[in-house]
Amino acid sequence: MSDVGPDLYAGLERAAKVATLLVASDLDGALAEFTLDPRDTTPAPGGMEALRRLAALPATHVVVVSGRDVRTLRQLTGVGSADPILLIGSHGGESSDPTVTVGAPLDRGQKALLDELSEQVAELVEHHPGARLERKHAAVTVHTRGLSEDSAAATLAEAELLGSDRAEVRVISGKSVVELSVSSADKGTALAALARHVDADATFYCGDDVTDEDAFRALDPLTGDVTVKVGSGPTAAAHRVGSVSDVVAALEQLLALREAAVRAS
């Protein structure tokens, strides 16, 4: 038994024994604590190490799934092109491995729309000191972490309005963030496609925000999948942990169980 709790431990124990296992996690809020500046994000000690060791085991596939673009994910996680860990960026719109297709590339119209949205968001941020803009592969994001509650609410409401009347723009509201995406890709579709690609018998996934709910709904605990919500709030996940350090503990426990299963096989 471990400190992850008996129900989650039982799920990890079952998943560790399957023939082919897919291990996936969000970055921000799951593998890494939030920072005022999203460029300063650093994975918590132990998490990436556990993922690398899992990826080195037979029939064990590891992926980080994030709203960040793949280029930024490489910088923040330290995962290189020769690394066995796959990176899925832009909520499922990008893959670090060209042989793994999880989303369609942006067309000319989508790229032009993204440029237009970026200009509009840049103007918005100028009028709200402390708000930050992040340009991604298929989206532009407004971050308000660190702002007063009233200032953050006003900024995010204005950001939502920029895309609310445009059918081709997906407005994603999360924790201290609003993202305007020109892609319909989501983490659930990407994770399901990846599970089929590797022929996974079970998938582990943990995440903390609204976009992770797509992944939770795409997986099925009744067939052996393990879904873990980080933090409070309503969720479709079967399990819940309270913090990033709890995610690291769960990954380390899964690693120990998977290593034991490999030795016993």
Question: Could you describe each region identified by the protein language model?
Answer:
Residues 1-6, 18, 183, 188-265:
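Mg2+-dependent phosphoryl-transfer enzymes with acidic/Ser/Thr/Gly-rich catalytic loops
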Residues 3-19, 73-79:
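Short amphipathic alpha-helices and their capping/turn segments at secondary-structure boundaries
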Residues 16-39, 64, 191:
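Asp-based phosphoryl-transfer active-site loop
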Residues 42-135:
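Active-site phosphate-binding/coordination module
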Residues 90, 96-112, 172-200:
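Substrate-recognition "cap/lid" segment bordering the active-site pocket of phosphatases
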Residues 117-121, 154-163:
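Short amphipathic alpha-helices in soluble, non-transmembrane regions
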Residues 130-147, 170-181:
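Charged, glycine-interspersed solvent-exposed loop segments at helix/strand-loop junctions
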